[in-house]
Amino acid sequence: PWINPENQEESFNMLNTAQADICMAHLDLNGFYMHENIRQTHGYDKSIVSRFEKTITGHFHTKNDDGQIFYLGAQYEMTWSDYGQQKYFHIFDTETRELEAIPNPFTIFAKLVYNDDETNYDEFDISPYHNKFVKLVVVNKKNNEMFDRLLERLYHKITVHELKILE
């Protein structure tokens, strides 16, 4: 269940009486990471699923667990908060009760750190930024013409969904 004020009583009753060893739900439990550095503190106590051998749940974007409760995390990047975190698809074997995590190789966010003291951007491979939301973080820009040529390439040689320049 997704527990909310309209179904809270019914959901708790279901969690307490279900004839099951495994719970699969969309839960908001305290102590787990919602995002990489943000731990939930205003949800439900995890004891509401303590009677289950294993609880597999969603809702939080970051994959994390305590050995009994498994947050699968988002399967793909949705926001910049997901950037840099490996995302997974999962297979649950109902006979062995093993949960297999399969890495998702695809991402939609990318950062490009610009430092023209270290890199010649006229020769820089921009293909990894194709079909991405890109943050261009400018650390050192002494060659304005090369910077402009890089921007021109990003806008016209590949497709970027969005380009944010942080100077």
Q: Residues of each region from the PLM?
A:
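Accessory, non-catalytic peripheral segments of nucleic-acid enzymes
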Residues: 94-167
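Short, low-complexity, polar/charged sequence segments that are solvent-exposed and flexible
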Residues: 16-19, 41-45, 74-75, 88-91, ...
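Surface-exposed beta-strand edges and their flanking turn/coil or helix-capping segments
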Residues: 10-14, 36-38, 83-86, 112-117, ...
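His/Asp/Glu-rich metal-coordinating catalytic cores
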Residues: 1-70
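Short beta->alpha connector loops
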Residues: 2-7, 75, 117-119, 141-143
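Short gly/pro-enriched beta-turn/loop segments at secondary-structure junctions
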Residues: 18, 50, 84-87, 94, ...
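Short flexible/disordered coil segments
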Residues: 2-5, 87-90, 163
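Active-site-adjacent helix-turn-beta-strand microarchitecture at beta-sheet edges
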Residues: 54-57, 65-121
